[in-house]
From Swiss-Prot:
Keyword Transcription listed: no
Name by which UniProt lists this protein: PTS system oligo-beta-mannoside-specific EIIA component
Disulfide bonds listed in the record: none
One of the GO BP terms on file: polysaccharide transport
Length: 110
């Protein structure tokens, strides 16, 4: 996935990009668990990989925001940005939990 540059985006557009990528990742993570339940283990792994790509894109955007602010360009606080960051962090936590669950299921042949 090509890295998106945030230099020409508004703060709202940046927030929506974070929400978009973390939302896509969250959907893939949930679909992965459902695929595994249906016995589609390869599909489950592919969905986790897709989720990781979206999370990587979101992380890149977030990192650019941090770099921008550390360079002296302040980021305005907004409820939308707070929601976007919450969405990203909860999706990262969900991914780690589901990956651990899938590893456990595989280890126990469930």
């Amino acid at each position: 996935m090509e890295q998106m540059k945030i230099t020409n985006l508004t703060d709202e557009q940046i927030s929506f990009q974070l929400i978009l990528h973390s939302g896509n990742a969250r959907s893939c993570i949930i679909q992965s668990l459902r695929a595994y339940k249906e016995g589609k283990k390869d599909e489950a792994d592919a969905l986790i990989a897709k989720a990781e790509q979206d999370l990587s894109a979101a992380h890149d955007i977030h990192f650019q925001m941090i770099q921008k602010e550390s360079g002296g360009e302040a980021t305005a606080f907004s409820l939308l940005l707070m929601h976007a960051e919450d969405h990203l962090m909860s999706t990262l936590s969900m991914k780690e939990l589901v990956k651990e669950m899938l590893d456990l299921f595989k280890t126990k042949n469930i």
